[in-house]
Amino acid sequence: MAIRRVMHVDLDAFFVSVEQSLRPELKSKPVIVGGKPERRGVVAAASYEARKFGIHSGMPLLSAKHLCPQAVFIEGNHRLYREYSEKFMQILSDFSPFLEPMGLDEAYLEVTGFESLHGSIGEMALKIRRRITAELSINASIGIANSKVVAKIATERAKPNGQCEVPAGEEAAFLAPLDISIMPGIGKKTEYHLKSLGINTLGRLAGIPATFLKIHLGTYAPYLLNAAAGIDNRPVEMPAEAKSISRETTFETDTRNHTFLEAKLGYLSEKIAATLRKRGKQARVVQIKIRFADFTTLTRQKHLNHPCSGNQEIFQTALKLMNGILDSDRRSVRLLGVGISDFCGPEKQLEIDPARARLEKLDASLDKIRQKYGFGSVQTGRTYKLKDLF
């Protein structure tokens, strides 16, 4: 029986690397993607040069500015990042059909038995990295091991722009000296709790009696014990199709401006509707989410009389839900979101409503233009108002 080999591929500082590939003058500089530091927001990605100042993803932009005043702050272009991600996944799929994407910038590959095609799995990893660099002008790091969890940790040890292979049978020895914080699934709270018990390394964690660990971590304990010993039998698999589509945005300042909220709701509705149509689906449920300035969050949903995928139908339903909340609540809004769910195939209509048919034709035309020139290339009168309100 062939020895199992799993590869974890991770693009280094992905958002920043994309920006640097298009703007060479940014290379070797501290670069932060996330927006302007004076705006309310967080760091989405930081270059390795910026990380030397203690900057990390999720940090408030203003804090990052204080740590590194000379950093270059970039708004970011998520449409561009998705395009790069699609090319990245296509490159990986050329090497193995057993591909499990994990977000835009990383994926697992099942590569057991692929030695005969590439000489060795290490050579295969090198080919992948070289092709990514050649075609995307960004670097990738790769970890190789007998399981997903060990391969991912190996990737962390390989960064940046390197590769690390853990030989079969040496997983426990590889993991033993490493700090528990490197283990996927151990967050800050669990790390603090384990270290308060004197458990600082994965080797120490692997040797803790299961009964003792279960008292402190509950049902999560068996997984952690196995993972710390390099045991992880999870398969590499394509993710199931998402059961919902949603978009939300946090505002720079809390607002009660209804014109602004309606325009933003229209924009979010058009984005999720376009994604739904791209999948060839319709939705039966529309939901909105509102978070107020005091962080209280309310959600409301509506089951539609018939499934739809149109911009106008989704927006009008979401608008009624939003107004139903705001008409009776005068608090300022911090976050607004809209979602759709309960998908089905296109509905067969015995009688076609002319008005609905015209809207469907309009949506299809918008989709074609936006796919070619970008979502902002054409706007409705409602969303165009956002330009005057930002």
UniProtKB/Swiss-Prot annotation:
Co-factor: note: Binds 2 magnesium ions per subunit.
Give the positions of the site Substrate discrimination. F15
Name a single GO biological process: error-prone translesion synthesis
- The record lists Mg(2+) as bound by D10, D105
- What InterPro entries does the database record attribute to this sequence? DNA/RNA_pol_sf, DNA_pol_Y-fam_lit_finger_sf, DNA_pol_Y-fam_little_finger, DNA_polymerase-Y, DNApol_IV, PolY_HhH_motif, Rev_trsase/Diguanyl_cyclase, UmuC
Q: In terms of domain of life, where is this protein from? A: Bacteria
Please name the catalytic residues of this protein: E106
EC category name: transferase
Which cellular compartments is it found in? Answer: Cytoplasm
Assign the protein's first listed, main location to one coarse class.
cytoplasm
- The record places domain UmuC at 6-187
Q: Which GO terms describe its molecular function?
A: damaged DNA binding; DNA-directed DNA polymerase activity; magnesium ion binding
Which of UniProt's keywords are assigned here?
Cytoplasm, DNA damage, DNA repair, DNA replication, DNA-binding, DNA-directed DNA polymerase, Magnesium, Metal-binding, Mutator protein, Nucleotidyltransferase, Transferase
Question: One Pfam family from the UniProt entry?
Answer: IMS_C
Show the catalytic activity.
DNA(n) + a 2'-deoxyribonucleoside 5'-triphosphate = DNA(n+1) + diphosphate
Give GO cellular component annotations, separated by semicolons. cytosol
| Cofactor(s) demanded | Mg(2+)
EC number(s) per entry: 2.7.7.7
Could you describe the subunit structure of this protein?
Monomer.
For this chain, the family text in UniProt reads: Belongs to the DNA polymerase type-Y family.
Protein's job: Poorly processive, error-prone DNA polymerase involved in untargeted mutagenesis. Copies undamaged DNA at stalled replication forks, which arise in vivo from mismatched or misaligned primer ends. These misaligned primers can be extended by PolIV. Exhibits no 3'-5' exonuclease (proofreading) activity. May be involved in translesional synthesis, in conjunction with the beta clamp from PolIII.
What protein is this chain from? Answer: DNA polymerase IV
What taxonomic lineage is listed for the species of origin?
Bacteria, Bacillati, Chloroflexota, Dehalococcoidia, Dehalococcoidales
